[in-house]
Amino acid sequence: MVDSGSQNDVTEDAGRARSPARRAFDAFAALLDGPLTGLAPWIVLAVFEGPGRLEEAAGAALALSVLFLVVDRIRGRSLKLLGVLDVVFFGTLMVVHFVLDDAGQEWMETWIGEIANITLFLVAAGSILARVPFTIQYAREEVDEEYWHTPRFLRVNYVITGAWALAFLVAAVAGFVGDAILHDSDDIWTGWVIQTAAMLCALQFTQWYPDVVEAAAAVEEGDPTATVPGIAELLGPLATWLVPIGIITLAMDGGPTWLGIAFIVVGIGTNSVLRRNEQTTDTTEEKASS
């Protein structure tokens, strides 16, 4: 008979030795369980929409919306507000696109980005006012029911939903500035950099804030090993995106050459510092455990 300790060791070794394919599958499954699935069709629309491409972009977004909705139901997951909105919005957009004349289609192609972001803002803000923040539907499927109505759980979801609402509003305002004030829907800053940065900040905040709340609670309960993540843990990972932003700035002449180079240098430098700090932390933890 194999003792339980040996079995645990084998299980842990197997977990550490997971194949890249298995790790990729687990990562994909984790994404399916989060709000990113509800936002993915909107990202597809933002990436592919443009003059003469609205029909294709809306069609791809609608197909992805239906796919995620069906997969959720097959996996036994509940219907999500954002998932239903995706199907309704992009289905309606397809119908409207076909019934509009050329002038109407041109207007829609100009303003669809702002319409989409304002719609998302209203959904996020409305869900808060309705006391059912849209992220809570995803979070409830990741924790036991006994925690659903605890102040900490509710506060985390209100704050995270608020962060997404702010990101959608920033993106909408940036797009409006590009279209209505600069009269340039292809402006790299208002059309891409600012809007993408807002979404990335909200996504990183979604990962960072629950850890902060959990660690703060552990500190209050007297756990000497608990450490509350600082602002560096929030902003640090975002530096990864400075490199592609710098490259795109240079490639598309989106600003002074020095600015694009500065983005790349700061991004690479920050990533190097973060990796060095992680290695130092791992070494310290290994010494402490040995």
Role assignments for model-derived ranges:
Residues 47-64:
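Structural signature of hydrophobic alpha-helical transmembrane segments
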Residues 165-185, 243-261:
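Alpha-helical transmembrane segments and their membrane-interface junctions
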Residues 22-34, 52-56, 78-84, 158-160, ...:
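Short, amphipathic, aromatic/basic-enriched membrane-interface segments that mark the entry/exit
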Residues 124-142, 160, 204-216:
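Membrane-water interface of transmembrane alpha-helices
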Residues 184-229, 270-286:
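Alpha-helical transmembrane segments and their immediate juxtamembrane interface regions
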Residues 79-91, 108-116:
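Cytoplasmic-side transmembrane-helix entry/capping segments in multi-pass membrane proteins
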Residues 108-127, 190-200:
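Alpha-helical transmembrane segments
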Residues 143-166, 187-189, 215-236:
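Membrane-helix boundary/juxtamembrane motif in polytopic membrane proteins
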